[in-house]
């Protein structure tokens, strides 16, 4: 049965759920991938990610090629045409195959009467492709970002915004974290080479390896045994500032899916770690990661604004707060972020971050370390957030990350090869 399923129609349905219903691709895609063969899973992912990466270009092309957009019950056809255009523009799929499979997708979504329309639009694009692309190269949509986000990036990063946008529009690299309790990084790289894969180290993060070409996890030496974990280099940077030690009581707040929880335990296997997240469903990923790596932590569901509900009056030696954020630093990994976020979200997120910071600080021991981290590149959530916190918190001191005038360490996507990420290390003064 699996080989009869039309991939293009599944991709169109997934994109419709993201754009029309505001669902996250990471929630929508896995159930659809279960319907197809292993070799087709990667193509389905490529079609979904690719269309969302280039959505504003595909939208512009459809407006040029069609007299009026498809609406209502025909809306899925609109996204099916996008899938067709994406294949013609960005994949090595032979045009005749891309056309035939996309047109056939109309049958799968129960719109067989529109096969001729889909075929006509895609063939018209083939005829006019060169002229259309020349015109699009001058259009404001060419940056493939919504206007509100482009404006914020230009304001925040007047010198670098074009590099950031370009990085956001690329396929992401695949970074791994070698479990130092099993192998040194060099030892594991030798195993990787034996497996026929090539990897590169990171100059700043001692456990990080970037694959020359992304590979499925089952191809990685010892993945199932916990020798290695998929985690972006920038996320690994948290340990440079947290510096966990054996015997300490450590809180990992907003911990799902558990990448940083397990990194803490790799660096300090005898630490007593509590991992907390508000999302019960995502906590299952924390359990999965702990199990694969053979580790133990206290895992709790809880709201970061109300720590007393899940830890009483307890205080911690170190706290890692990976705060909820706009995720504007990981757009290349999650291109749906561009279309799911709204401008108004940024102020709401900044308010939530401030509330969590305030309440969490009360549970840090005097002399203790709190690392505030986000995968955002917007100052409202990062340097401005920390400036405001330092101004209202007399016993907080910035350490090893920036200056009081410009607090925190900001990684941008691209130049550092990792994702966009922000860290601020705060020490609680002793009385």
Curated annotation (Swiss-Prot):
Disulfide bonds: none annotated. PROSITE patterns: NOL1_NOP2_SUN, SAM_MT_RSMB_NOP. It holds the Pfam family RsmF-B_ferredox. InterPro entries: MeTrfase_RsmB-F_NOP2_cat, MeTrfase_RsmB-F_NOP2_dom, NusB-like_sf, NusB_RsmB_TIM44, RCMT, rRNA_ssu_MeTfrase_B, rRNA_ssu_MeTfrase_B_ent, RsmB-like_ferredoxin. S-adenosyl-L-methionine binds at residues 254-260, 277, 303, 322. The keyword Cytoplasm applies. It is found in: Cytoplasm. Its main location: cytoplasm. Specifically methylates the cytosine at position 967 (m5C967) of 16S rRNA. This is Ribosomal RNA small subunit methyltransferase B. It comes from Klebsiella pneumoniae (strain 342). The gene is rsmB.
């Amino acid at each position: 049965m699996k080989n009869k399923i039309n991939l293009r129609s599944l991709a169109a349905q997934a994109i419709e759920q993201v754009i029309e219903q505001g669902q996250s691709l990471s929630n929508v895609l896995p159930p659809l991938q279960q319907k197809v063969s292993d070799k087709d899973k990667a193509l389905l992912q490529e079609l979904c990610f690719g269309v969302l990466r280039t959505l504003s270009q595909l939208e512009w092309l459809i407006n040029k090629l069609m007299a009026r957009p498809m609406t209502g019950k025909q809306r899925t056809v609109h996204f099916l045409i996008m899938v067709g255009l994406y294949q013609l523009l960005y994949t090595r799929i032979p045009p005749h195959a891309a056309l035939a499979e996309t047109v056939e997708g109309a049958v799968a979504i129960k719109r067989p009467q529109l096969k001729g329309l889909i075929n006509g639009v895609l063939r018209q694009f083939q005829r006019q492709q060169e002229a259309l692309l020349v015109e699009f190269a001058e259009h404001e949509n060419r940056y493939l970002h919504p206007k509100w986000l482009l404006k914020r990036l230009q304001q925040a990063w007047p010198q670098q915004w074009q590099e950031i946008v370009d990085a956001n529009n690329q396929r992401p690299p695949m970074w791994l974290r070698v479990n130092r309790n099993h192998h040194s990084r060099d030892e594991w790289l030798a195993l990787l080479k034996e497996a026929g894969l090539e990897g590169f180290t990171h100059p700043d993060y001692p456990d990080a390896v970037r694959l020359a070409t992304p590979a499925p996890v089952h191809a990685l030496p010892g993945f199932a045994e916990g020798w290695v974990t998929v985690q972006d280099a920038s996320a690994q940077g948290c340990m440079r500032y947290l510096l966990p030690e054996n015997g300490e009581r450590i809180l990992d707040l907003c911990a799902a899916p558990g990448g940083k929880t397990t990194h803490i335990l790799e660096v300090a296997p005898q630490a007593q770690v509590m991992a907390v997240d508000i999302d019960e469903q995502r906590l299952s990923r924390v359990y999965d990661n702990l199990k694969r790596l053979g580790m133990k932590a206290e895992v709790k569901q809880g709201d970061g604004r109300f720590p007393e509900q899940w830890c009483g009056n307890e205080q911690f030696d170190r706290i890692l707060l990976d705060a909820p954020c706009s995720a504007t630093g990981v757009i290349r990994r999650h291109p749906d972020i561009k279309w799911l976020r709204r401008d108004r979200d940024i102020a709401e997120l900044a308010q939530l971050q401030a509330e969590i910071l305030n309440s969490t600080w009360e549970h840090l021991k005097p002399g203790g370390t709190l690392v505030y981290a986000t995968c955002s590149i917007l100052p409202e959530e990062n340097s401005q957030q920390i400036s405001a916190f330092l101004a209202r918190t007399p016993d907080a001191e910035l350490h090893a990350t920036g200056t009081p005038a410009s607090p925190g360490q900001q990684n941008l996507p691209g130049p550092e090869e990792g994702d966009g990420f922000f860290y601020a290390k705060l020490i609680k003064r002793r009385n």
